[in-house]
């Protein structure tokens, strides 16, 4: 299974895309990038998941860390397809510590999470998010913030979720960038609840300013609000 997937990935290789995409991935060894576009990877992962059983896929899923960046992305997209929550969580927990870049971290969300989110996400997803956010692994923390942002800033919102992310104390760029993304998104969806975080300087300086920058870039925020946010930059 491992050799089969690697062989197919090289068949999909796009050298111009490899050159472009490599520049966006400073945290990983450039030699590990084959150069396969995400839509191609996602389509291939769906085909593999449909054709093979989880048992068939286990040699690949257990082969961590993977040799190639695109193998990580295939792994993520395979996890995304698993419909059984417990099995999905098991495979996700095994995989998260091996994520070594922002792109793999951000490009997938298990479909079963979406089903859970429609029922009782506070009972099932929220404890997992809190666990991930307290991790020592950069991209596990980032993943947790991303899932919180995806499922808990709309009708399931509670102001305590803002405190959960604001209380993260990290010097890691890829964690703080996700924190800024979270708060910028929160400003577009829960403005009244989120604004005091900015007005009262709750965040560290870098995340504070990056949040404002990203919010100002959003088309979902009015011109008047953007002008006010500009005045809050430090």
Q: For each predicted feature, which ranges?
A:
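Alpha-helical scaffold domains
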Residues: 1-234
């Amino acid at each position: 299974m491992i050799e089969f997937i690697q062989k197919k990935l090289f068949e999909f290789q796009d050298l111009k895309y490899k050159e472009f995409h490599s520049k966006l991935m400073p945290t990983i060894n450039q030699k590990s990038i084959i150069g396969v576009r995400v839509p191609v990877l996602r389509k291939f992962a769906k085909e593999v998941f449909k054709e093979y059983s989880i048992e068939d896929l286990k040699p690949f899923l257990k082969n961590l860390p993977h040799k190639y960046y695109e193998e990580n992305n295939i792994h993520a997209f395979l996890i995304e397809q698993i419909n059984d929550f417990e099995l999905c969580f098991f495979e996700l927990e095994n995989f998260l510590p091996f994520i070594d870049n922002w792109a793999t971290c951000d490009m997938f969300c298990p479909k079963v999470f979406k089903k859970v989110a429609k029922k009782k996400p506070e009972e099932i997803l929220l404890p997992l998010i809190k666990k991930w956010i307290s991790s020592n692994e950069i991209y596990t923390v980032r993943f947790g913030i991303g899932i919180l942002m995806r499922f808990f800033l709309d009708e399931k919102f509670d102001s305590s979720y803002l405190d959960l992310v604001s209380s993260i104390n990290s010097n890691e760029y890829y964690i703080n960038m996700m924190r800024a993304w979270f708060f910028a998104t929160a400003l577009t969806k829960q403005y009244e609840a989120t604004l005091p975080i900015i007005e009262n300087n709750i965040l560290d300086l870098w995340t504070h300013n990056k949040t404002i920058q990203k919010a100002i870039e959003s088309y979902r925020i009015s011109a008047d609000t953007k002008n006010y946010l500009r005045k809050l930059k430090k």
